[in-house]
Amino acid sequence: DSKGNIWVGTDGGLYIYNPILDSFTEFNLVSDKGTIIRDFVTMIRCDEHSNLWISVENQGLFYYNSSENKLQNYLHDAGLANVHRFWLNGNTCWLALYGDNLYYTKADFESPLQPFKDANGDEIFKDDIINCEIVGPHNYTYIASSNGLTEVNFVTGKSRRILDAFARTLEFKSDDELWVGTEKGLYIYNLTTDKITHLTVPDQDDSYALSDNAIYSIYRDSENGMWVGSYFGGVNYYPYQWTYFEKFYPREEIKF
């Protein structure tokens, strides 16, 4: 947050880590609805005003005003408490409910939730599980879900399915290269050529290849290196290629 603290969501509530004191403090502020964050925290996001939004399984969406130290609880009693993921776009809040649909409303939640419909009037995320979203160029947003990778322009409503594999995570390596983590390996989508490269675990051991097909997280660091976290195979690292070189593999039958 703006004070340098790290907010940690767990399966039993929310904690604040102070790196200076090296200490954790439980966040147990009572909301305007008399609720306290006690369940599985599915997501934490900070807005442009340094206020925090927290989605909690079975408890809905919380808004923490850091300057006033006040907590508001939305959707907790509307039968819509299973907020799996959310994001803010100006004064609009987008909410992905687990196995339900993608909805939007004003960030003050004074208007009812509306399901998203594309330009053809179809609810393309109905019964879907949205796992990740990332904003790309030309007003397009890319959404990873249980149904695959979808490209959406929320201004025009135009949408198209790019990939059908169960997608969990997204990260741009560059403006025209999107990495997609799925249960079937890593897909690299080139926005310029509209081509997809599919990387999977090879049939034989290869220290330079992907270690597991179940990709759960992708992160680009400050040096443009790509970190790929998997379910069974640990973490893979792909450094930025300042220069290209050929890899040579050792063979036991050849000795010098």
Question: At which residue positions do the language-model features occur?
Answer:
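Carboxylate-rich, polar loop motifs that coordinate divalent cations or form catalytic acidic clusters
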Residues: 1-256
